UniProtKB/Swiss-Prot annotation:
Highest taxon of source: Bacteria
EC number: 2.1.1.-
Compartments reported by the entry: Cytoplasm
UniProt similarity note: Belongs to the methyltransferase superfamily. RNA methyltransferase RsmG family.
SUPFAM superfamilies in the record: S-adenosyl-L-methionine-dependent methyltransferases
Protein name: Ribosomal RNA small subunit methyltransferase G
Binding, S-adenosyl-L-methionine: G76, F81, D99, S100, S101, I128, E129, R147
Gene: rsmG
Gene Ontology annotations for the cellular component aspect, listed alphabetically: cytosol
Enzyme class: transferase
Amino acid sequence: MTKESIPNELLNLLNEEEIIMFRELQIKIQELNYKTNLTRLIEGDDYWISQVYDSLWTFKENTNKNFDNKKFIDIGSGCGFPGFAYAITHPNSEIYLVDSSKKKTDSLKEIIKSIKFKNDIFVINDRIENIGRQSSFKNGFNIATARAVSNPSTVSEYILPMLKSNGLGILYCGKWTNEDNKNLEKTLNVLEGQILEIKSNFLPREKGMRNVIFIEPKASCPDIYPRSIGKAEKYPLKG
């Protein structure tokens, strides 16, 4: 793929070494896709915009926040976005990628072996409800992300218990309505969290609208969260 095929909006966010790593990552995911259906967003703009740019703009364009040298967890990593994108552009951070599908976590491990990441990257094959109740992980992260995983109210129950007192949760969403906002606020109130900021962006080349919701703890999240497997999705907290 030629550099010219990468949108300028993305070229402006990356250096040459990072572009090379993202190309290598694309090739490896393409290879693994023959064995495991990781993603359909792997060619052309689907990869460079819907995967790479969509993962990165929230980190690169929020210059008022420090995203470097952090302990980072991505919940429901799938093929590795935004986790790998964050790792490539923040090489001093420690990365944890979580997915309940063993096929996907096996593929993530293969990718890590193939790409020369500078980070320490750990892959966990488990449900986040289990991980979030372990003392070695609970309240242990500076940044927790979830992209294309369930609804925001459900995801916030996964994210808040993982965050340190000054941590930041990042929820990637497509559309965002006033009703979504009200529901999330009610859920966060139960979890002792709050919405910090909502940012919107039209992705380049007509790839659609993206909303990113930043959430943070306002006090310690009650120990009973996250609830046991499936409850957050089946019975979202409503305040």
